[in-house]
Amino acid sequence: MIQMTPTAQSQPEVAYQWMKSYIAALPREEETFLNEGVLAKTTGTSRTPVREALLRLEAEGFVKRVPHKGAYVPPISDPDVRAILQARAVVEKWAVSAVESMSDAQIDAFQRIIDQQQEAREDPARFIELDTEFHTLMVRAGGNPVLADFYASLRQKQLRIGVKAVSQGTDRAGDVLREHQLIVDALRGRSLDAAHQAIDAHLDSTRLAVIGY
């Protein structure tokens, strides 16, 4: 762990941001316990801000807590990856069913995220944060708050899966940019079939990049 110095942010926020980035980069297959003392030293804070950050991360699904043992990051198995991507396919393809009524402004918002991702290609955590933002925007465009909340519940697992995919030395980031562009082009052309095909291709490529089959 690389020790950091707190900035103008509050100490709980410093601890939270550092731990979220650290967790996103962990091997997804491994269970990792988090030591409050080590985290306090590494983030340049103290145990109280670390505990506050852990409670926030627990609420968001990034960590789990065991009484008398502390917090840990649960593993994400290959079957988990497949199940998550299958769920995403159902939700995302439903969400774009209203493509004909999407405004140019909505579609322009997708393009802006792609442009930001292009600038963040060398920062896997930021790149995947933007990736999640891209897909969340797509789901929200569907106008179903229940599905949007369900999709949001997958956020922490999507971050870890995505960071793993773009950190393996291949040009997965470049592939993602091209795949996202195909989705946006389909939306701009108001073609539901093309949008569905682009979403399926994108999620299939993600699965292959992460688990290899």
Regions found by a protein language model. Name each.
Residues M1-S101, R207, G212:
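Short linear motifs at protein or domain termini
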Residues E13, D78, A89, I107-Q111, ...:
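Amphipathic alpha-helical repeat elements characteristic of tetratricopeptide repeat
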Residues I84, F110, F127, D131, ...:
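Hydrophobic packing residues in well-ordered alpha-helices of helical domains and bundles
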Residues A87-M102, T132-T170:
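Hydrophobic, amphipathic alpha-helical faces that serve as interaction scaffolds
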Residues V91, I113, A120-D123, L130-E133, ...:
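Amphipathic coiled-coil alpha-helices
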Residues E92-R126:
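Amphipathic alpha-helical dimerization/coiled-coil segments
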Residues Q118-E119, K164-Y213:
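C-terminal all-alpha effector/ligand-binding and dimerization domain
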